[in-house]
């Protein structure tokens, strides 16, 4: 199996490659038509084909899925994958990747903040021998609050994760077939795509672009979801939180030993014990809070282990729509 997976990379690829674009969408009825128009226009400009766009609908409650169905019925290049409920952004990306057929796979969000016109540049770089070409976002056009949150998020991941994750790089990237297959076969229940593609290695390169403003509607990434994504990145690729708990525990033990030694000296040589009832209460309260915090950290790791051992699927597909070239 491993030898098969390592085939189909960038080295030695002959002929004109087929391109697949994998896009997760959720309640994007105001964007779907423009998204398809721009992506298909880019695919039309590329040699070879037939290329395709695979849209994974993550349990939308608006007209997103019906619009995808209509587009897929008209155009064999459009493939729709409907999930049975909302499984989350990363799961929807996984669903799209599981249905692509291309030699190179572009992963991008459906809000058009990642300009589809960059796909041709990504492909050109990938054909120079790179298995992954990821986009580094510069000059983001979101609100100041979101820009600050994203800046904190990227630096948190870079400092805590046991990977050299590039700052500013999101999910927008082009993958070789072998990297795509490796990600697809990853058994992790809670995948963190940008971490996985870095972990697998191979030749990678970053491409800086200026990110567009959202085409319409509101961002589906709330502060809570952004925090959740950051935690996924940290807990999936680092044991540093556990090590911090160990280090802090050792520090507290050392401080306690020093204070006990100090109390003994004061008692022996001065005949009384150090006073400080308020300080004692504050110390107990502080240490209790620290203990609860790190119990939460340990609980997070245990909870993720629990999710892994249940072996539930990453997502459940309700329907797939794909028109064949014969019109069937």
Model-derived features with residue positions:
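Acceptor/aglycone-binding surface of glycosyltransferases and processive sugar-polymer synthases
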Residues: 79-85, 89-99, 104, 116-196, ...
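Solvent-exposed polar/charged
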Residues: 73, 98, 124, 128, ...
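Hydrophobic helical membrane-anchoring modules
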Residues: 2-18, 192-328
